[in-house]
Amino acid sequence: MAKAIVDPEELRRFAEELKRFNGDLQNSMSSLQARFGALSDTWQDQEHLKFAQDFTDTMKTLRRFIESSNQQGPFLLRKAQRIEDYLRQR
């Protein structure tokens, strides 16, 4: 017998919070990238090169997270709807 072991409303709230978080993260990343670009005009030693590579790698990882979690949000909302439909049938 199938069971619903999640509160659909909690799932919806999480999906909405994830969407907000992704938006905030994208805005922060854009701002930080602009500041880092400006910093590159005055910081040009070996440490800058090392940090720039780490920074770039981290930004790529964060972009992949945002892409993945942006796909998960709608999935979670559909799942919440299916669970709610299932619970109404009981």
For the regions a protein language model found, what residue spans apply to each?
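N-terminal secretion-targeting helices of virulence/extracellular proteins
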Residues: M1-R90
